[in-house]
């Protein structure tokens, strides 16, 4: 039986994913930032109530992937916490100012992670040379890489994804961004073993009173009266339609556009 991974931004989403057939969860906060490190409260609650494997993201802020010393120190502390809480894996990524994988920091990340499976997220798509980056990540012992082939969506980047897959069996190449049921077969035909797609909806906030003249966001255009929710029916449908009984493919369903 193939694995189905859902990227969740709340305890409620994690429960929905689990109930509807997910085999693994990527846990994030802040969907509008593309996924940030979840709070301690969310981490502990999910660890206590979710029985399928959960991989939290370690990303202290939105934006680029070159971090200050203080930000990186916080990332290492978060990794230690995730490990202490008993999670089986995590998702993260760090770059140099020149767009290379920061190998010095990756060594520290891998040491802090210990036995946890590490996924290098779409910071990979911001690398100057994806093939050098993949070799470095293989040397570092990373389990998988999430990538759109350095294009706006994975369909456009499929040729690069195929070249990356041809480099070897490890790390696993997970295609993400714009992967849908109607183009999934293209990725399978290309030899993709894991894909990253969407199974969520934005719902209106239940707030009746709304102060339309005031925003709590730095982005005054931000919609603060909508909330992301994993759609159970979509999870179940994807699990039925796209999980191969051979167990050779992992279908990854993510909310919004997590890194």
UniProtKB/Swiss-Prot annotation:
Subcellular location(s) of the protein: Cytoplasm
One Gene Ontology MF term: copper ion binding
Principal subcellular localization: cytoplasm
Assigned GO CC terms: cytoplasm
UniProt keyword annotation of Zinc present: no
Keywords carried by this UniProt record: Cytoplasm
Quaternary structure, from the entry: Homodimer.
Family of this protein: Belongs to the CutC family.
The protein's name: PF03932 family protein CutC
């Amino acid at each position: 039986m193939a694995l189905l991974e859902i990227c969740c931004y709340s305890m409620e989403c994690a429960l929905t994913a689990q109930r509807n057939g997910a085999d693994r969860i990527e846990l994030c906060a802040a969907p509008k930032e593309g996924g940030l490190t979840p709070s301690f409260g969310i981490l502990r609650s999910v660890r206590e109530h979710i029985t399928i494997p959960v991989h939290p993201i370690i990303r202290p802020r939105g934006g680029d992937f070159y971090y200050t010393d203080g930000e990186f120190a916080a990332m290492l502390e978060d990794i230690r916490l995730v490990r202490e809480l008993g999670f089986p894996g995590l998702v993260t990524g760090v770059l140099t100012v020149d767009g290379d994988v920061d190998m010095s920091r990756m060594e520290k990340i891998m040491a802090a992670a210990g036995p946890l499976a590490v996924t290098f997220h779409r910071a990979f798509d911001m690398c100057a040379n994806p093939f050098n980056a993949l070799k470095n990540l293989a040397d570092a012992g990373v389990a998988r890489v999430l990538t759109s082939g350095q294009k706006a969506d994975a369909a456009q980047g499929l040729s690069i994804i195929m070249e990356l897959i041809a480099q070897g069996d490890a790390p696993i190449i997970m295609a993400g961004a714009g992967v849908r049921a109607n183009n999934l077969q293209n990725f399978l035909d290309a030899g993709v073993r894991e894909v990253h797609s969407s199974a969520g909806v934005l719902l209106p906030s239940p707030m009746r009173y709304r102060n339309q003249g005031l925003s709590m966001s730095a982005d005054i255009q931000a919609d603060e009266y909508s909330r992301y929710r994993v759609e159970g029916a979509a999870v179940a449908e994807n699990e039925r339609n796209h999980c191969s009984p051979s167990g050779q493919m992992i279908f990854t369903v993510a909310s919004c556009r997590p890194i």
